[in-house]
Swiss-Prot record:
Binding residues for substrate: 111
Broad enzyme group: isomerase
NCBIfam families associated with the record: hisT_truA
Gene Ontology biological process terms in this record: tRNA pseudouridine synthesis
Native species: Bacillus sp. (strain KSM-64)
Organism lineage string: Bacteria, Bacillati, Bacillota, Bacilli, Bacillales
GO molecular function: RNA binding; tRNA pseudouridine(38-40) synthase activity
Keywords: Isomerase, tRNA processing
Protein known as: tRNA pseudouridine synthase A
Enzyme Commission code: 5.4.99.12
Subunit structure: Homodimer.
UniProt catalytic activity: uridine(38/39/40) in tRNA = pseudouridine(38/39/40) in tRNA
Amino acid sequence: MNNYKLMIQYDGGRYKGWQRLGNGENTIQGKIETVLSEMVGRKIEIIGSGRTDAGVHALGQVANVKLSENFTVKEVKEYLNRYLPHDISVTEVTLVPDRFHSRYNAKDKTYLYKIWNEDYTHPFMRKYSLHIEKKLHIDNMVKASQLFVGEHDFTAFSNAKSKKKTNTRTIHSITIQDNQGFIDIRVCGDGFLYNMVRKMVGTLIEVGLGEKEPEQVLTILESKDRSQAGFADATGLYLEGISF
């Protein structure tokens, strides 16, 4: 039995997220499993590191799949890229130890959120970034972002559908960079609740627009009140990388 680790990139714009929810669901996981199943002639299931929401993109999703066949990594990669839709790519395939599990062995995940902060639409990135015309106050956003760093109960920044045993997570770092009209927000942590990054970014945007004070981040965290947090569109969000 061979355990293959897949590095995956995708444009999530037309999909219902990563996780296969049932037969016929238009998901990234479902598309990859369909191609692998055709390759080996039986039903195949893969394990993904991160369950991205509908519309969210990935630059560094990781999955693993166990196959009894002795395919080379080149054969697996070439077959997948030949038959997957053009908005899903497998960038690397490697053989890993049998015990490797892409979800349970993941230590940290990094998400990137892209904002186009100019008074005109970016013709090429309009589907891959959130457009905000009003100039954002970056210094206030940076100040607010650092209040997320550390271990906190992120109930206020989770979705009501979240069914985790605990809503406590640790954020290792948040950086905000102004890059030629784009504002790139990177969030690195040990794990994320459903909609957590989008709610964090949405709140930072409200701070940048002057709708909230930076210090209110702590108030919202302590309140555990989901209605107090902002919510950013999925368009600008990317799963950038996972460390093991």
